[in-house]
Amino acid sequence: MSTAPRHFLDLFDVPTTELRAILDASVAMKKRRKEGRIADKPLDGKTLAMIFDKPSTRTRVSFDVGMRQLGGEAIMLTGAEMQLGRGETIADTARVLSRFVDIIMIRILSHDALTELAAHATVPVINGLTRRSHPCQVMADVMTFEEHRGPIKGRTVAWTGDDNNVLASWAHAADRFSFNLNVATPPELAPNKLLKDWIRSSGASIKLGTNPEAAARGADCIVTDTWVSMGDKDGEHRHNLLKPYQVNAKLMSLAKPDALFMHCLPAHRGDEVTDEVIDGPQSVVFDEAENRMHAQKGILAWCLGAAG
């Protein structure tokens, strides 16, 4: 009797003990790599299918290289090539790919398409990004925080900007890893009803507000993201609403003296963050970028039941 595949779709789907095991494996694999111990190939002979409906440099390279470092291989498929959901049904695509590959990563705007793919796949499916959430990114962020500042449990993270997929996964992480999350957004760009309802039901230590200074005060880390994503309309209007939410030296000064600055990149310098902050000593954005690969290696190994 075959067991159900171990998907990685959202942080709240995975028990805290399992998320911690993934991070521990990710840290160990990174350490071995830095020490030149590269003989371990736990995914030797395994193939990852990467499906991209939304373009990405970091997601593609980090999954591709990470899979190769684990001894496997990766193939890339684009939405244009696959006509995902427009030609063959998503369910049939999931069934067919499951016969060819060992694991699937999909980066697609529609979260419903992700869950439908996972429902019909007989191999693990990883959420590489949807409009609703970005769990791989926030696993890398938690890994990065703990590299620099130790356990994140009980610490305070401030989010300043708008409601988006990265914020949602930070909220899920606050619940799973037991840290405080202060959120500051313009009233017009506040967290959506689905996320607010989830926050309310989760009991997580999350404060929603509109004042970036209040959110940042005493924080251990300040996080932001680009104000206008691909496909967003009314970019100029959003930009005007978000100007007061820029992360600059003044805002960073309200956080703890050793507070970190995080951004998942690419950054629009001069908009959501100043050069002074993103290039400054508190910024760990390039560590985050590197840790995308290491965290995803941990996720790949976990999904496939392989030792990291």
Swiss-Prot record:
Top-rank lineage group of the source organism: Bacteria
A GO molecular-function descriptor: amino acid binding
Transferase in keyword set: yes
Metabolic or biological pathway, per its Swiss-Prot or TrEMBL entry: Amino-acid biosynthesis; L-arginine biosynthesis; L-arginine from L-ornithine and carbamoyl phosphate: step 1/3
Entries under Pfam families matching the protein: OTCace (PF00185), OTCace_N (PF02729)
Annotated residues for binding of carbamoyl phosphate: 56-59, 83, 107, 134-137, 264-265, 292
Binding site for L-ornithine: 165, 225, 229-230
InterPro entries reported in the protein's UniProt record: Asp/Orn_carbamoyltranf_P-bd, Asp/Orn_carbamoylTrfase, Asp/Orn_carbamoylTrfase_sf, Asp_carbamoyltransf_Asp/Orn-bd, Orn/put_carbamltrans, OTCase_ArgI
Keyword Iron: no
GO biological process: arginine biosynthetic process via ornithine; citrulline biosynthetic process; L-arginine biosynthetic process
Keywords from the UniProt entry: Amino-acid biosynthesis, Arginine biosynthesis, Cytoplasm, Transferase
Entry EC no(s): 2.1.3.3
Record-level GO cellular component terms: cytoplasm
Intracellular or extracellular location(s): Cytoplasm
Catalytic activity from the UniProt record: carbamoyl phosphate + L-ornithine = L-citrulline + phosphate + H(+)
NCBIfam families: orni_carb_tr (TIGR00658), PRK00779.1 (NF001986)
Function statement: Reversibly catalyzes the transfer of the carbamoyl group from carbamoyl phosphate (CP) to the N(epsilon) atom of ornithine (ORN) to produce L-citrulline.
Family label: Belongs to the aspartate/ornithine carbamoyltransferase superfamily. OTCase family.
HAMAP family cross-referenced by the UniProt entry: OTCase
PANTHER family associated with the record: ORNITHINE CARBAMOYLTRANSFERASE, MITOCHONDRIAL, ORNITHINE TRANSCARBAMYLASE, MITOCHONDRIAL
The protein's name: Ornithine carbamoyltransferase
Organism: Nitrobacter hamburgensis (strain DSM 10229 / NCIMB 13809 / X14)
Gene name of the record: argF
